[in-house]
């Protein structure tokens, strides 16, 4: 029986050694149930070579029914219904931690957005209440003016307050000229306005004062009960034609 059939390691050249090292780049190897002894021998050969660059990595399993597996130079048997060994779940734990951190960050963002929206809603409700409390005397328009910093804006309401009509100019010259302007160049209206302002109104005002004078002159004031007339006669000497 040759030394190779007995499973005894044979020293090889450097080229063969590099090919053996490249053949053992996989960290874990799946082996059938009938070849468990060969798997143990191969693990011993691997430890004999003393590969310093050997490092562990997560287990990769696809479509297994019932087989043996080498994990860190130890032969183990697994079934389909059996869970993956604990050493192979490290990568999944890291993934779960990343997922949990992402979900926690998303929940924080959502809670912050909800707080911001609630703050906006409370501010809108407060402004609506303040606007409802203000007495709306006149209709106005809203004017938004930028602030000095350029970031905030101040909002103000301008109300259009109705103003009283101007006091008319009661001077004769102004009233007469305005009346002439309203005549629109009509000769008949201009003559009528002139006759009214220069003849009729002076006659009425002068006649009124003359009528008042004649009332005081021809009014017969007697001593009986007319104390006002007596005081006028004594103090002012009015109505001297009347005798006591």
Curated annotation (Swiss-Prot):
| Membrane topology, as annotated | Single-pass type IV membrane protein
Residue ranges of the motif atg8 interacting motif (AIM): 28-31
Name of a matching Pfam family: ATG43
Listed Acidic residues bias regions: 113-131
Knockout consequences: Abnormal mitophagy during nitrogen starvation. Decreases vegetative cell population growth.
Q: Note the InterPro entries from the entry.
A: Atg43 (IPR013898)
All ranges on the Cytoplasmic side of the membrane: 1-198
Q: Where is this region: Involved in MIM complex binding. Required for normal vegetative cell population growth but is dispensable for mitophagy?
A: 165-184
Q: State which ranges are Mitochondrial intermembrane (membrane side).
A: 216-244
From the Swiss-Prot or TrEMBL record, state where the protein is found: Mitochondrion outer membrane
Please give the superkingdom of this protein's source: Eukaryota
**What GO biological process terms does the UniProt entry carry, in alphabetical order?**
mitophagy
Quick one: where is this thing mainly located?
mitochondrion
Q: What induces it, per record?
A: Increases during nitrogen starvation (at protein level). Repressed in nutrient-replete conditions in a TORC1-dependent manner (at protein level).
Q: Where is this region: Disordered?
A: 1-24, 105-131
Q: Name one GO cellular component term.
A: mitochondrial outer membrane
Keywords carried by this UniProt record: Autophagy, Membrane, Mitochondrion, Mitochondrion outer membrane, Transmembrane, Transmembrane helix
Tell me where the transmembrane regions lie: 199-215
What does this protein do, in the record's words? Mitophagy receptor that tethers atg8 to the mitochondrial outer membrane to promote selective autophagy.
Q: How does it assemble?
A: Interacts (via N-terminal atg8 interacting motif) with atg8; the interaction is direct. Interacts with the mitochondrial outer import machinery (MIM) complex subunits mim1 and mim2.
Domain writeup: The atg8 interacting motif (AIM) is required for the interaction with atg8. The AIM motif is required for atg43 function as mitophagy receptor.
Which protein is depicted?
Answer: Mitophagy receptor atg43
Its taxonomic placement starts with: Eukaryota, Fungi, Dikarya, Ascomycota, Taphrinomycotina
